[in-house]
Amino acid sequence: MDSKYIQKTLSAITEQITKNAAVQKVLDNKFVKEHKYAAAAATVGLGVVAATTIVKAVNCEGKRYNYDAIPNLSFDDESIYDVATIGAGPSGSVLGYYLAREGRKVALLEKKVFPRDKYCGDAVATMAQDILREMGVMKELVDEDLGHFAQNGGFVSPNGNSFIGNSAKELKRDAKYNRGAVIAVKRIVLDEKVAKAAKRMGADLKENTTVENATFDRSTGVWTINCVDSEDNTKKIVYRARVLVCADGSPSNAARQLGYVHTEPNGICSRAYVKNNTTFRYDGVVFYPPSLLPGYCAIIREARDELNYLAYIIPGGKVTNDDLSKYHHQYMTEDPFISAALGPNPDIERMKAAPLRLGGIKKSYDDHLLIVGDAAGFIDPLTGEGIQYAMEGSRLASLALIQAFNERDLSHQSLKRYQDFWMAKFGHEFSMSMTMSLFLYRFPIVLDAAASLIEKRGSRFLAEWAAVMTGVKPKTWFLRPDVGPLIVLEIFGECFRRVFQGKKQIKKLD
């Protein structure tokens, strides 16, 4: 806040105090004059109490929402939805699926008409795979050849160290994983499959519906959601719901309009599908060009032998979101590894881009309100992975809402358990991911050493690495005594090689 504004405000307050007769009477009191310090301390204490009360009121903290004081509250009015989600992507539809399964009346308000595209890396990791199996979607994807499980892959470090291995084969040897590390599914396919699964379960899917605004009536405990037909803006539609869920993606338009999110998305990613007439023969490789750190590029194999070339810009480095197009196209021809993988004349689509909100938001709940998925920043700052956290977060949100409805308590104190759930499951990892991301930007030699270590230890070690990067294992794995010291030793070895063996000769991927 501007210091001149503060001084001006304080001057105005002082002026009003000096003019106030009641205040002057207190200041002229004999006790106050004789005990100035005690009076000052009491005044400060009262000020702190008043400020705390105001903050609690603003943040909706403190006393539990009193439902007995809401004269018109009803949990039985069938004209009112139990829950309405703004957005029917993976987060909104997964939430709708689980709530509908429990008999709750849910409206999924989707701006577009399925099938509709979204831009990301298309990599669906383990937690999301479990949910897709439960929804029956995974069987559809496999039966219709719409997803591709990664069988082999690796990464290329900033200095050009690389290793490609068969992590999937190693994961299958370990019964506790019981699924592939990643399956690539195009979002135009995945989102429709998940939304239709929610609809089959009983959720009311409202496509072609743009939400203009939503208002909460505290006297009835009901949201009024004003919408228009996305193709015919003159056609007005109104829905009413007891709980509003913001599931409208990284821009978080609904949550921003309601005052719960105050920042722009802090990352961005590109996507370009490539017809597989290239020399690339792996399922997935991550490239760490030095100029893009802490971001990265990747090439992922999709179903039916198509590739997905993408670049992620993650906050903390020199590059900004505005640099995405420049680096996306530059690496295609100038990076020795990416250009070799794509070949001289790749049949590649025009670059698409999507914003990213990374690291989670501070508060994702309020009275009769939840914020889920990308809108809540459920994207890992180290890997850019978001689909599995969006889906798992919504599964956890359904548990919180089911319990809240059973208790007939939709207060923020009741719905806070949702925040507790996702923080305990994956949110606590986000701060470590951000720290690691910044650390790798400052010390890229760590990635060089890691690639060398994986090359020495083989596919089993790569599988463990993949388990960490896909959320199966916590990132504290890097601190284990059988991992951390080895990376440190490899860093010393990398330094030695650079000093005594000179500049590394660039090798292409085999």
From Swiss-Prot:
Cytoplasmic topological domain: 1-36
SUPFAM superfamilies xref list: FAD/NAD(P)-binding domain (SSF51905)
Membrane topology value: Single-pass membrane protein
UniProt keyword Membrane, yes or no: yes
Keyword Plastid found: no
Keywords: Membrane, Receptor, Transmembrane, Transmembrane helix
Gene deletion effect: Null cells show a 50% decrease of the CMF binding and a loss of CMF-induced G protein-independent gene expression.
Primary localisation category: membrane
One GO cellular component term: membrane
TM region positions: 37-55
Any GO molecular function: FAD binding
Function recorded in the entry: Receptor for cmfA, that appears to mediate the G-independent cmfA signal transduction.
Stated name of the protein: Conditioned medium factor receptor 1
